[in-house]
Amino acid sequence: AGHWRDQREKIEQGAENVVQALRRYATEGGAHAVAPEGAPVPLHEAAGEAFEKGFQYFHEAHDARWGGFGGAPKFPRASIIDFLFRSAALQGVDTDPGQAAIGMAATTLQRMAEGGLHDPIGGGFHRYSVDEQWHVPHFEKMLYDQALVALNYLEAQQATRLPVFGWLARDIFAYVARDLT
């Protein structure tokens, strides 16, 4: 409320700028985004730059030995894995960056399944691991994690053609159907 009272004109001008940019976007058929200085930037170029920067960031953060991103505690980070599969598709799955993205995602998913994050008895995946090797799970399972991780495993199966990833997705679905519904 204080910002509205103190900076109302600035907020209204910002809103007007957004509306004008959306109008230009709609008028141009969505083919171009508008850069801050007004020069049109093709959307595929802007998306490519964003994916490239994101890919570099996650490549540097990736734990090549144990999979995942960063140290303990380690979470599945389904959105990062999803980003890596999208990045591979955008860059080309047969290119070096595409293969690197698939490799980071697949290594992470494989290490998660081999470690204590996957519950081989009850099915599904625990929320996170308290150690960097994925050995010691935090004994809690969340429905939303099951959904996101299952999608990651399905995409991994499609990208790598390794049946184990599809099997793990089915394991998650069976756990959810049996214990969480």
State each model region's role.
Residues 1-181:
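Replace the tail clause
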